[in-house]
């Protein structure tokens, strides 16, 4: 019995250590997401460029696209292989033809998860974990023999308002893969037939290692 108790205690300690690691990893990654989206908000003039009421000159359009591309390059450099995708949803569609990551705000409003964005009073909010609707590459993979598996992401949203009317004129979305969020690459190996499970607030399974 003493040997059994020792094994049980070892297992409990290892489990506690692993759960602490997952919690710490998620906290650190959430802090990283907040830092990135706040930096974007600080550096970019989103209320001006995303508002459909503003007619942008060709020079302004080029400036915005170049500035966003530079920011994303900086993010990749500072946080390599950390984020899955970043998207700009705008009521101003002038830039959409020039920037592959810009989409119409009206398209976002038609999504079933748009209500979860506007329901939050804070400018920055986390969405429910869901399958990504974006490809991390602009390459068309439909006819290529590449992995097309579903990518689960935690989306984080920044609402952009008209400074006078307080109407939403745009939304910035930053996605992190759920595997990156929990730090899957560094999770301790618990042994055969043992998986890690992560549930949301509704007890819905959103992440599982192994099978």
Q: What is each of the regions a protein language model found here?
A:
Residues 77-83, 87-175:
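Extracytoplasmic/periplasmic ligand-binding sensor regions of membrane-associated signaling proteins
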Residues 42, 85-93, 195-203:
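Short hydrophobic alpha-helical segments used for membrane anchoring or interfacial signaling
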Residues 38, 42, 53-64, 73-79:
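Juxtamembrane extramembrane loops of integral membrane proteins
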Residues 21-23, 55-62, 101-107, 114:
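Second-shell loop/turn segments in exported
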Residues 1-55:
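Juxtamembrane extracytoplasmic/periplasmic/luminal helical "stalk" adjacent to the first N-terminal
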Residues 6, 10-14, 126-132, 171, ...:
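N-terminal sensory and localization modules of signal-transduction and trafficking proteins
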Residues 48-50, 89-101, 203-210:
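Amphipathic coiled-coil signal-relay and dimerization helices
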Residues 68-76, 112, 148, 161, ...:
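Solvent-exposed, extracytoplasmic
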